[in-house]
Regions:
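A domain-start/cap signature at the N-terminus of enzymes
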Residues: 30-74
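The feature captures the conserved acid-bearing segment of alpha/beta-hydrolase catalytic domains
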Residues: 206-269, 273
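C-terminal catalytic histidine-bearing segment of alpha/beta-hydrolase fold enzymes
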Residues: 245, 249-252, 258-324
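Active-site machinery of serine-nucleophile hydrolases
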Residues: 83-151
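Residue-level recognition of tetratricopeptide repeat
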Residues: 336-337, 371-374, 405
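Helix-start (N-cap) detector for alpha-helical repeat units in TPR-like alpha-solenoids
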Residues: 324, 328, 345, 363-364, ...
């Protein structure tokens, strides 16, 4: 986090550190202490014509931003929603907090299973993990092969429903584990434009005599442009020679050797984890990979101003395909840091002016900008800001007092 990095790099002497603690808002030097609220979700029933059945769906929505009531959010769709929905929702909720700020707030759509083998396998096959046919009367593989039909359900029915009923951005992530992993890979290979980023945790490439490895070899050509992100991983699923591990190395080799334009990829191996514990680490690492450029990079702190911050968020907007707005609280904290540490009042004012432009309904933004103008000695501009803050929120007694003080001797 950029604020912690500020402290580690720039506050070597205790006396300076103590001075900074006195002058700086708490959230710049430590985590905030928000009231605990358990994850809650909308639970909907979607009648699918594609699947000819009703499907239960879990949907987590970030808290309403009162300053940006029309704010829209990226969406993460996760398979095995009955197992992984709450885990991912908690990760996203924490990592998007204002005092963490390494990813955006995001809508989570969990897709619980109804017939997992049917929906999460791309072909019909009765060949098991050991390469032997399961011809028993109760073979769990008999219903397999509905994966492409399931992707049609997601693309033609689920995504349109979510887009119609929730405030979504175009950036979408598709995440899955094991059979869910080959489902996300199959989507990337056959319908890459359905999602912007893909997560495949221990994908079951063994399925149907490594069908998807052959498909990857066919589809991932170096003359293709695939402007997507993909994170894939495996764990200790039978030592280093396990089918999961060797097959994922084959897939990774295809991705690396083809050097596909625009395909941003990362492979992670978790030898100390099992097939079922791996998602706890892998989903976190996948989110950090996809949004690794989200926070402001460390730079020459004296040069931080509105131009630098705007440029960073313009780059994020281009990367993720929607307009990304700098968080009001974080911009204010950077401005206060610049004043306390460098006396860089003009740079701080440029940041606070940007806040009033991005958050025109925020009385706090105008009040804080008024404080900065007053500190500079520009009473007339301070008065304008205080009046604007009071117009937005008339009951602010502290702002009324500031306005009275700034108006004297004008």
């Amino acid at each position: 986090m950029i604020y912690n990095s500020f402290l580690k790099r720039h506050f070597r002497k205790n006396i300076v550190y103590i001075f900074f603690i006195v002058l700086t808002p708490k959230c710049l030097i430590a985590q905030t202490d928000p009231a605990f609220k358990p994850i809650s979700a909308d639970i909907i029933k979607l009648s699918s014509k594609v699947l000819d059945e009703d499907r239960k769906i879990y949907i987590y929505i970030p808290p309403v931003d009162t300053l940006l009531p029309d704010k829209r959010y990226p969406v993460l769709y996760v398979l095995d929603g009955d197992n992984h929905f709450s885990l991912i929702a908690e990760y996203c909720r924490y990592l998007s907090r204002k005092d963490v700020n390494v990813m955006p707030e995001i809508i989570i759509v969990g897709i619980p299973n109804k017939n997992r083998t049917r929906d999460l396998t791309p072909t019909n096959s009765i060949i098991d993990y050991d390469g032997k046919p399961d011809t028993s009367s109760n073979s769990r593989f008999k219903s397999s092969g509905g994966g492409n039909n399931f992707l049609q359900f997601i693309g033609a029915e689920l995504i349109p429903y979510v887009d119609a009923h929730y405030k979504t951005q175009p950036f979408k992530i598709f995440a899955g584990h094991s059979f869910g992993g080959i489902t996300t890979i199959n989507c990337l290979l056959t319908q890459p434009d359905m999602f912007s980023a893909y997560i495949a945790i221990s994908p079951s490439f063994w399925w149907d005599k490594e069908y998807l490895l052959s498909l990857a070899d066919e589809k991932l050509k170096n003359d293709r442009d695939i402007n997507k992100m993909i994170f894939y991983s495996d764990a200790d699923e039978g030592m280093s020679e396990s089918t999961f591990h060797t097959n994922l190395l084959k897939f990774d080799s295809i991705v690396i050797q083809r050097k596909i334009v625009g395909l941003d990829h990362k492979y992670a191996y978790y030898p100390e984890d099992t097939h079922m514990t791996e998602p706890v680490k892998a989903y976190y690492d996948a989110l950090r990979f996809i949004f690794r450029q989200w926070d402001l990079p460390l730079t020459d702190l004296k040069s931080l101003n509105a131009t630098v911050v705007k440029q960073h968020y313009q780059q994020l907007s281009q990367r993720y395909g929607y307009s990304v707005t700098p968080p009001e609280v974080n911009v204010h904290n950077i401005a206060m840091y610049l004043i306390a540490q460098y006396g860089a009042l003009d740079n701080a004012i440029s940041l606070l002016e940007m806040n009033t432009q991005n958050y025109p309904a925020s009385a706090t933004a105008f009040s804080q900008l008024g404080d900065a103008y007053l500190k500079k000695g520009d009473r007339s501009k301070a008065v304008i800001c205080y009046k604007k803050a009071l117009a937005l929120k008339p009951g602010l007694q502290n702002v009324k007092a500031k306005l009275a003080g700034a108006s004297e001797n004008q």
